[in-house]
């Protein structure tokens, strides 16, 4: 039971006795709103005007929430587990100490979820696609920051999403209340104290009758002067020459300005319909991403040259998202979604090698890219008794890109790409066994103007999920699915660009889509304050598109091809304890990834161990949070892409709608770096990238919001789409 003021400010919270009785003590006279919630029942709201010091409310009846009880396994007082999702109900303490939806997500410590405030990101450990939603509507992290914790009913954590979510591995859906009048405004600002780093968020929402108007804006400036790299390369040229070069980096400049704007209008004309229109504008201006240093010939100490590698790039991505949902009789739903996106990208890279003022190598790559895309989707759902459901869907993506490459020569590419996806899925239950059977068909089409040959592929994508409830506290789940992966437009371009004095990057228009086979097994157990999640998976991708390098005269050509196969064995174990006395909570995750990469002319294996840990301490109005992530390294083709070693420590104080805090990134190390390697027999490298300012970076945080109006239950959006592929071939080492 939560007692709030009329503007939703938290006053007090209690739990009922076994007989359902409750009392709020020392409550001043005034106007209040009482929020009553219980697992398995719809949340109730009672407006209390002119409350005296002693008030008897009499019997209160809550309506049964069938949506929360059909085919579920109750695993605790704050969580309900289904076959495809968890319904997570934050505690009063967690909501009270959090300033927004991102802070609350950190407090919940859900499996695989990583919050990286350094990069203003919510992601998955080890990568993979994560979808964020608010009442089913596609959202970005800055929109999640705009959510008041008091408005959150629950968070739906889909760790086993169905076919309609595409290739998403996890979906986080914030189910929030929608004011029928009034609205809310707020700001969340973080600023570095010893370097130019910031995350600035402004947001607002206003409701009038059946309409809702909202906006959110994020700006993230970064200006570092301590970025550099150390690199070791070894080249074996076709004429038998072997060269080993060492690059010793010097501190250089890294500047970046990120901008995200969301403007939304939604109309709920009736309880059975919802229309939403969202205009998004994404942008990133990166005028400096510069490296400089000295190149040494390891076999000849007198062979020394100066190196400069500067990149100036920017992109802008406006999009319009139109969504309509109509609920029909007999638990049927129709959903329509159309998204149009324009992506403009500019990039200039200057690479020079010189000695005594004489330029030996001079590479100037300029790229101008324009991409237009349209995504249209329709979904039908039919709900049956006991949680059984049937769904069908059709989506099509059509894109066109025009790219100009200038590097001493002029290249122009015009590419068309189409992707059609049809699926059907049935979810059912037999006693303690929940199952989900699905099948999808995919068509991929690609054509580059000026080329006679077009590419068209079809694939069959089945999926199956078996979820067995072993007890009220544990379950075992097996999943197997097959899906299609298509080449990016940038990789398909036949343009070539010089990388340095020895290397050339070249696309491959003959790339073909390939199949991905995935299976995983999950065991979960929860009892009281203890939670354990064990997970193992195997991935097999024959004919995967991976990198390769070939000799061509006195040059090494970097390109891509359909290789033999790529495989990965993964294992992960998570233990979470808490909240202890609603004050202390901590979690630990450890795991291993074993990669097997088999190319047409190479074969590599690599094993990576990793761990993650989090701890939070909440006492009265103070909260302390600590997080550490060790390297989760990925190996693809012949390239090892290193993860980040991240630590974060922060302490906050919250008073009503105001929260202030101080924190530090990597407070216990002065050697932040990201490692990467390539194991090719003709041109290998080992690179360490450093940003000095990312170690012992101290910051302050300020969050404030205010709201007005009442709340009511709103319709929930079912799908989201977006296009984030620029269609441009990358440059640089």
Task: Give the location of each predicted region.
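C-terminal beta-barrel architecture of Gram-negative outer-membrane proteins
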Residues: 203, 590-597, 607-654, 658-686
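Face-selective signature of the C-terminal outer-membrane beta-barrel domain
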Residues: 258-286, 308-453, 457-462, 469-473, ...
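Outer membrane beta-barrel strand-and-loop segments of large Gram-negative receptors
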Residues: 373-375, 508, 512, 518, ...
């Amino acid at each position: 039971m939560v007692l709030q003021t009329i503007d939703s400010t938290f006053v007090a919270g209690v739990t009922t006795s076994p007989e359902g009785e409750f009392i709020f003590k020392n409550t001043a006279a005034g106007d209040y709103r009482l929020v009553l919630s219980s697992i398995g029942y719809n949340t109730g709201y009672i407006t209390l005007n002119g409350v005296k010091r002693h008030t008897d409310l009499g019997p209160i009846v809550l309506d049964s929430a069938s949506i929360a009880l059909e085919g579920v396994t109750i695993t605790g007082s704050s969580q309900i587990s289904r076959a495809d999702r968890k319904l997570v109900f934050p505690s009063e303490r967690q909501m009270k100490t959090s300033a927004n939806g991102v802070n609350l997500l950190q407090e919940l410590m859900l499996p695989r979820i990583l919050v990286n405030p350094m990069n203003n990101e919510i992601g998955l450990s080890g990568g993979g696609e994560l979808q964020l939603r608010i009442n089913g509507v596609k959202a970005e992290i800055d929109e999640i920051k705009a959510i008041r914790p008091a408005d959150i009913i629950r968070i739906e954590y889909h760790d086993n999403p169905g076919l309609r979510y595409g290739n998403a591995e996890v979906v986080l859906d914030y189910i929030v209340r929608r004011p029928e009048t009034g609205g809310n405004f707020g700001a969340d600002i973080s600023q570095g104290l010893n370097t130019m780093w910031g995350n600035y968020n402004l947001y607002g929402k206003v409701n009038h009758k059946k309409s809702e108007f909202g906006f959110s804006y994020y700006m993230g400036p970064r200006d570092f002067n301590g970025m550099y790299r150390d690199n070791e390369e070894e080249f074996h040229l076709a004429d038998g020459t072997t060269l080993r070069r060492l690059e010793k980096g010097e501190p250089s400049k890294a500047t970046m300005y990120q901008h995200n704007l969301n403007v939304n209008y939604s109309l709920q004309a009736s309880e059975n319909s919802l229309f939403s229109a969202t205009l998004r504008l994404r942008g990133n201006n990166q005028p400096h991403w510069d490296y400089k240093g000295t190149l040494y010939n390891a076999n000849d100490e007198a062979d020394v040259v100066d190196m400069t590698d500067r990149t100036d790039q920017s992109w802008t991505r406006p999009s319009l998202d139109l969504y309509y949902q109509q609920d029909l009789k007999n638990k049927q739903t129709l959903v329509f979604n159309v998204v149009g996106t324009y992506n403009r990208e500019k990039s200039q890279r200057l690479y020079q090698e010189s000695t005594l003022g004489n330029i030996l190598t001079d590479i100037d790559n300029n790229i101008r890219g324009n991409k237009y895309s349209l995504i249209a989707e329709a979904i039908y759902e039919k709900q049956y008794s006991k949680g059984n459901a049937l769904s069908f869907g059709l989506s099509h993506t059509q894109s066109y890109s025009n790219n100009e490459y200038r590097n001493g020569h002029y290249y122009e590419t015009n590419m068309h790409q189409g992707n059609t996806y049809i699926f059907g899925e049935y979810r059912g239950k037999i006693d303690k066994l929940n199952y989900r059977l699905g099948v999808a068909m995919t068509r991929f089409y690609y054509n580059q103007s000026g080329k006679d040959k077009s590419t068209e592929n079809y694939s069959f994508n089945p999926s199956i999920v078996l979820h067995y409830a072993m007890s009220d506290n544990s379950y075992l789940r097996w999943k197997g699915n097959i899906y299609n992966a298509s080449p990016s437009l940038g990789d398909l371009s036949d343009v070539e660009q010089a990388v340095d004095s020895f290397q050339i990057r070249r696309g491959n228009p003959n790339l073909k889509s390939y199949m991905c086979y995935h299976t995983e097994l999950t065991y979960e157990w929860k009892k009281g304050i203890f939670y354990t999640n064990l997970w193992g998976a195997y991935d097999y991708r024959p004919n995967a598109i991976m990198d390769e390098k070939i000799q061509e005269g006195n040059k090494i050509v970097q390109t891509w091809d359909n290789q033999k196969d790529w495989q990965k064995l993964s294992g992960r174990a998570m233990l979470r304890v808490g909240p202890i006395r609603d004050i202390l909570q901590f979690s630990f995750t450890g795991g291993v990834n074993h990669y097997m990469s088999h190319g047409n002319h190479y074969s590599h294996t690599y094993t990576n161990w990793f761990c993650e840990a989090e701890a939070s301490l909440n006492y009265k109005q103070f909260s302390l949070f600590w997080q550490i992530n060790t390297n989760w390294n990925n190996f693809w083709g012949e390239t090892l892409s290193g993860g980040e070693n991240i630590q974060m420590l922060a302490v906050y104080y919250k008073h009503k709608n105001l929260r202030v805090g101080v924190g530090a990134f990597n407070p216990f190390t002065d050697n932040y770096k990201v490692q990467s390697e390539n194991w090719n027999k003709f041109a290998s490298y080992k690179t360490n990238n450093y940003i000095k300012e990312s170690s012992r970076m101290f910051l302050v945080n300020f969050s404030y919001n205010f709201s007005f109006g009442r709340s009511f239950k709103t319709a929930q959006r079912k799908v989201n789409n977006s296009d984030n592929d620029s269609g441009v071939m990358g440059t640089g080492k």
